[in-house]
Amino acid sequence: MVTVDEVRKAQRAEGPATILAIGTATPPNCVDQSTYPDYYFRITKSEHRTELKEKFQRMCDKSRIKKRYMYLTEEILKENPSMCEYMAPSLDARQDMVVVEIPKLGKEAATKAIKEWGQLKSKITHLVFCTTSGVDMPGADYQLTKLLGLRPSVKRLMMYQQGCFAGGTVLRLAKDLAENNKGARVLAVCSEITAVTFRGPSDTHLDSLVGQALFGDGAAAIIVGSDPLPDIERPLFELVSAAQTILPDSDGAIDGHLREVGLTFHLLKDVPGLISKNIEKSLNEAFKPLDITDWNSLFWIAHPGGPAILDQVEAKLGLKPEKLEATRNILSEYGNMSSACVLFILDEVRRKSVANGHKTTGEGLEWGVLFGFGPGLTVETVVLHSVAAST
């Protein structure tokens, strides 16, 4: 007779969860940040609000973003004028867009990841799908399963309305699924479109304008599995540990509320301070088992949030400027894509590591950290182990 313990042992993988492929995608519509204030105030018929426009111009100038990608074009917004007002009922129009476009953009990123992985998509056993853009039943996980032609028996998990920390959550879940299910290959997808948050300006809700200055659209996909097949699968990073915590005294620091007017965004000014004040505690807890206390000895993947968060984290930890270079570059080239950002940064780090001739996928270093920050304030901390870089 086989015991339960024997069954459990047989179900578990031997090695750590490993990222085997990464794919990214954006909508084709590219928006230049330098001209965005003129466009935004024109399309929302708010050009007469000159003082508010000047404030928004300053926000965009300070954002350190060069360009963003957006599904919403001028044509789409002209066809849906309610989305251009500050508080007009518009959820139906927004939902009609995102329930179609979120899985489509996710498919683009997933297709690239599957191609890099090089295996049959029938070997994907689990699907984790994450979005803060729109809610539907059956969800985007179901739609993506159909779009990609995955097996009907693929085990799906749908994550809605988590926000900017969720790229870390996706990695944490994929790690647990891969390590506790021998032979599992997990496709994890983050797909975000700002059609749910776009709205006109308001004098009394300046934090909404911060969101209009920062957020962009993008999707990223990874494939995660333990015990990579030699000479068939190419490891990129190993997922060593993953933790989540709610920061003290941070209630209401970042909120989003789904209403008839879409998803409203609320932000307190002390968010950068709250994150920078607490980040070392998360680092100490994550790296104590490895006896690492030099944060400059790590490669860094941090959700960009906005430039103020990065500046304060850098100063608080005494990080060298190059540590957050990949993070700042993704913010500059794409804006804040919510949950997808950290996976874009992970992709950038491994690609530049190869291009620059580093010995490992982590900029030549062995250990790294991935941080996700978002509503709560919630922080996800993932410890990464690089592997030998291969061209």
From Swiss-Prot:
Residue intervals passing through the bilayer: none
Assembly and binders: Homodimer.
Reaction(s) the record says it catalyses: (E)-4-coumaroyl-CoA + 3 malonyl-CoA + 3 H(+) = 2',4,4',6'-tetrahydroxychalcone + 3 CO2 + 4 CoA
Record bears the keyword Transferase: yes
Annotated catalytic residues: 164
Database matches in InterPro entries: Chalcone/stilbene_synt_C, Chalcone/stilbene_synt_N, Chalcone/stilbene_synthase_AS, Polyketide_synthase_type-III, Thiolase-like
Gene3D superfamilies: 3.40.47.10
Enzyme's top EC category: transferase
Listed name of the protein: Polyketide synthase 3
Species this chain originates from: Rubus idaeus
Keyword field: Acyltransferase, Transferase
Known pathway: Secondary metabolite biosynthesis; flavonoid biosynthesis
Pfam family, any one: Chal_sti_synt_C
GO terms under biological process: flavonoid biosynthetic process; polyketide biosynthetic process
EC number: 2.3.1.74
